[in-house]
Amino acid sequence: ASSTNLKDVLAALIPKEQARIKTFRQQHGGTALGQITVDMSYGGMRGMKGLVYETSVLDPDEGIRFRGFSIPECQKLLPKGGXGGEPLPEGLFWLLVTGQIPTGAQVSWLSKEWAKRAALPSHVVTMLDNFPTNLHPMSQLSAAITALNSESNFARAYAEGILRTKYWEMVYESAMDLIAKLPCVAAKIYRNLYRAGSSIGAIDSKLDWSHNFTNMLGYTDAQFTELMRLYLTIHSDHEGGNVSAHTSHLVGSALSDPYLSFAAAMNGLAGPLHGLANQEVLGWLAQLQKAXXXAGADASLRDYIWNTLNSGRVVPGYGHAVLRKTDPRYTCQREFALKHLPGDPMFKLVAQLYKIVPNVLLEQGAAANPWPNVDAHSGVLLQYYGMTEMNYYTVLFGVSRALGVLAQLIWSRALGFPLERPKSMSTDGLIAL
């Protein structure tokens, strides 16, 4: 796969994968994947194996693997941007789509391709400029993405009767357009809400995706751009069962185009249980700083954590539905902080909590996973570089998540996945079993 054109590389991979799956299903189509219990049906289908999702797999102990590669491996192997050594999200997207670590040339082709596709249609700009300032940034993001479907190659081609075997090509084009435009939409929302509507400026085709994004947001610190490269890489995908990934997969299965599928995913990400956790962590840390005035002694922190738990709340940023060890997405953010902001008081507090919280949660005995997740750290890093607008953080998460769910959406259409339609049951029906 030496070609720098991602579509050409994909076109060569798809027939092989179609054949592999066809053979596998012929031989093992009837194999049972496990038992489904009554509790699973009432419990949000936790642990139920019912989806095929190719781009990443979550190992309870290892954490996320993107096409088989762990986060430390991705940090080592993916092409880097600046002198800071963080991987470029373009490289991760190439990996998610192809299963192959890209070359520097392939990544710079993607950067240029996205820069070329980035311009927003004027009606979307007008719409964003007309939103009231009290409309949540995630609502603005979702609405703008939905309105972008005026540009949908897939919807147009479907209306013209395109062959099923060509669906993936149009989904690819729309996914590439959408990823290219997302930083412009996100930056416009940021400037309108927090920078008096100032201009996001123009895309520079010589810069990478993250660098253009931080420029448009109005940040000039090269370290912040490095953080953005890391952030957009590690938040990109987390298996197929989480709310945003599952939503895009479900809506996409109705052959709704990538804009509609991704907007639906963003409405899921806007939910407090999915995308708001890093905001909640910062709120909790701020309260903790106010309360534990005794210069952050371990004992007073322990007391504060116990008070949180005893009042029936959870410690935000700790625990995960699947993970059973420290989230590697937490670890790489911790390493970034140790390298770039070791003296920051908020980072010191987060690092101190890392030593204390797991022990308290183990003593309490209720948590299956007492270790920190990705959200325990990201807010502190963003704040350090001056991005203090917590309401906006989920928008960054959303821009990143596009890489994973749209890579999968291309494959879902390439592999001809059908409309998703599980069977539901009533309580009476379950009791009658």
From Swiss-Prot:
Keyword Mitochondrion attributed: yes
Keywords noted in UniProt: Mitochondrion, Transferase, Tricarboxylic acid cycle
Record GO cellular component, one term: mitochondrion
SUPFAM superfamilies in UniProt: Citrate synthase (SSF48256)
Presence of keyword Cytoplasm: no
Pfam families: Citrate_synt
One BP annotation, GO: tricarboxylic acid cycle
Cross-referenced CDD domains: ScCit1-2_like
E.C. number(s) listed in UniProt: 2.3.3.1
First-level EC class: transferase
Active site: H274, H320, D375
Cited InterPro entries: Citrate_synth-like_lrg_a-sub, Citrate_synth-like_sm_a-sub, Citrate_synthase, Citrate_synthase_AS, Citrate_synthase_euk, Citrate_synthase_sf
Pathway the protein takes part in: Carbohydrate metabolism; tricarboxylic acid cycle; isocitrate from oxaloacetate: step 1/2
Reactions the enzyme catalyzes: oxaloacetate + acetyl-CoA + H2O = citrate + CoA + H(+)
Annotated GO MF terms: citrate (Si)-synthase activity; citrate synthase activity; identical protein binding
Assembly description: Homodimer.
Family named by the database record: Belongs to the citrate synthase family.
Role of this protein: Key enzyme of the Krebs tricarboxylic acid cycle which catalyzes the synthesis of citrate from acetyl coenzyme A and oxaloacetate.
Protein name as it appears in the record: Citrate synthase, mitochondrial
Encoding gene, per UniProt annotation: CS
